[in-house]
């Protein structure tokens, strides 16, 4: 048969299939723009500013609407009330994880980030319990973070106040913390394997947030047949997983069931004793994916947030001066910051919260999926339908945070200058899929940033007003722009 005829037949089949899927899926889904065959609503979505794009759709269709990514319908929740109602009030129904083809390719339904159903529930219970046993929320973990903060200060002092790209140095600190929890290792900041690990984690995150990767997620049939950066992602992920499998093998050979050293040991002990959590997957493959998830989540999210924080603090020198004044008054220069200090440092605490609110690192979180046929606000959402939560619409809500596009710690201070909590503070998402490492991440951000500002003045290479905050990519996550700066030791 003529190749051209074959091509036409294939395209015709895809067109008919797309039309059928779109028509059969609409049912009583929330309203939304009419999708085109094959591409759905992609022609209407600005991937460079999807937050504003979703806001514009919400003005037309309301806080709950449907968009088609290719032939796949995705229900979008916009605004605090809709997201709270779904993730909190209907938490069980919205607790599924959306099918993201590129992620599914590397996780194969294992780990904690992209597993489903009973396996995910059991894995989450195991992870939370084990992190608690290892000192999450206690002095045990705080001591690790404080120790790592001092190693970070030593490394920053080695720059001698000269211009440097902080990406790798800043990334080393949170990566060392999670590595010490997972497999009891902290690395020298020049260790080759350590730098390779961080470099590949950084590169994977950038690729996942690139426009090209979004196309492959929308048209997954292209993944196995087209060249692109996603192949580099798969290669990097294979290296990371192989490296961590090596750590697991070392643990198996030296395991003492009466004296667990770290996260891997706790897993291996339950695996060996066969009296663990019901529905838990105790295969080595599951452990390797779970550990990979923890290393990714505990490294790049913190690193990106801290780099954005450095840019903001250099750009807004009056805010930095207030934070450093509070540090001098409460902590001084001769002891390490601790979490108890946070209760006496409302402005610094507000600054850390405002960094996370302002940068809006994960604009739409990770896609959810309804676990059963669900009635939601008079709409019918069939089991398996994907759900996107616009966290931007909550973090930048102008009623809760007046002038949300302005970086202002006052968003988290009351009239008396005391720190005030906000239910709209959702950088870690909400509900049953909320980040398991939230408390650790909050601790690290406070201690690392406070320790940096206690020891250094931050000097940009350009005029503060010219500092560009525009992310390199803004997809799955926002990637900070490349920049150089100077860390000037405080005398």
Swiss-Prot record:
Superkingdom, natural source: Eukaryota
Pathway: Lipid metabolism; arachidonate metabolism
SUPFAM superfamilies from the UniProt entry: Cytochrome P450 (SSF48264)
Any single biological process term in GO: arachidonate metabolic process
Signal peptide annotation: 1-25
UniProt membrane topology term: Peripheral membrane protein
Cofactor needs: heme
Residues binding heme: 435
Record family assignment: Belongs to the cytochrome P450 family.
Keywords: Endoplasmic reticulum, Heme, Iron, Lipid metabolism, Membrane, Metal-binding, Microsome, Monooxygenase, Oxidoreductase, Signal
EC code: 1.14.14.-
Tissue expression: Liver, brain, kidney, and intestine, with trace amounts in lung and heart. Expressed throughout the intestinal tract, with higher expression levels in jejunum, cecum and colon.
Source species of the chain: Mus musculus (Mouse)
A GO cellular component annotation in the UniProt record: endoplasmic reticulum membrane
Gene3D superfamilies (alphabetical): Cytochrome P450 (1.10.630.10)
Name this polypeptide is given: Cytochrome P450 2C40
InterPro entries for the chain: Cyt_P450, Cyt_P450_CS, Cyt_P450_E_grp-I, Cyt_P450_sf, Cytochrome_P450_fam2
Pfam families: p450 (PF00067)
């Amino acid at each position: 048969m003529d190749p051209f005829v074959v091509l036409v037949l294939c395209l015709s089949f895809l067109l008919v299939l797309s039309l059928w899927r779109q028509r059969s899926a609409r049912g009583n889904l929330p309203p939304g723009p009419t999708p085109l065959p094959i591409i759905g609503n992609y022609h209407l979505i600005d991937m460079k500013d999807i937050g504003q794009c979703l806001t514009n759709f919400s003005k037309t269709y309301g806080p709950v609407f449907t968009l088609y990514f290719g032939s796949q319908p995705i229900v979008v929740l916009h605004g605090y009330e809709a997201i709270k109602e779904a993730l909190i009030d209907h938490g069980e129904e919205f607790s599924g994880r959306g099918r993201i083809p590129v992620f599914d390719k590397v996780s194969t339904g294992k780990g904690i980030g992209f597993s489903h159903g009973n396996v995910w529930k059991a894995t989450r219970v195991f992870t939370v319990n084990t992190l608690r046993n290892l000192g999450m929320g206690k002095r045990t973990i705080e001591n690790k973070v404080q120790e790592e903060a001092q190693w970070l200060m030593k490394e920053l002092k080695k720059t001698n106040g000269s211009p440097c790209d902080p990406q790798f140095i800043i990334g080393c600190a949170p990566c060392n913390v999670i590595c010490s929890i997972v497999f009891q290792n902290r690395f020298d900041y020049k260790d080759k394997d350590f730098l390779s690990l961080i470099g590949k984690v950084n590169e994977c995150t950038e690729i996942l947030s690139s426009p090209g990767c979004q196309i492959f997620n929308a048209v997954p049939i292209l993944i196995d047949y087209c060249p692109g950066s996603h192949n580099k992602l798969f290669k990097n992920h294979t290296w990371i997983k192989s490296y961590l499998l090596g750590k697991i093998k070392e643990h198996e050979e030296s395991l003492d069931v009466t004296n667990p050293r770290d996260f891997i040991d706790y897993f291996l002990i339950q695996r060996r004793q066969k009296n663990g959590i019901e529905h838990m997957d105790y295969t080595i493959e599951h452990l390797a994916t779970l550990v990979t998830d923890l290393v990714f989540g505990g490294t790049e999210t913190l690193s990106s947030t801290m780099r954005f924080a450095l840019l903001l603090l250099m750009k807004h020198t009056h805010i930095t001066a207030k934070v450093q004044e509070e540090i001098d008054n409460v902590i001084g220069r001769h002891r390490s910051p601790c979490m108890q200090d946070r209760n006496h440092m409302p402005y610094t605490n507000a600054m850390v919260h405002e960094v996370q609110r302002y940068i809006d690192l994960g604009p739409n979180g990770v896609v959810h999926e309804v676990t059963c046929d669900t009635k939601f606000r008079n709409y019918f959402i069939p089991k398996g339908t994907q759900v996107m939560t616009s966290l931007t619409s909550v973090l930048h809500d102008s009623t809760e945070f007046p002038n949300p596009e302005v970086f202002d710690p006052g968003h988290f201070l009351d009239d008396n200058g005391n720190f005030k909590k906000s239910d709209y503070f959702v950088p870690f998402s909400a509900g049953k899929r909320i980040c398991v490492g939230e408390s650790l991440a909050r601790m690290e951000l406070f201690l690392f940033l406070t320790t940096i500002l206690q020891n250094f003045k931050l000097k940009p290479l350009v005029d503060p007003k010219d500092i560009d905050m525009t992310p390199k990519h803004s997809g799955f996550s926002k990637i900070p722009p490349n920049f150089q700066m100077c860390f000037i030791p405080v005398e």
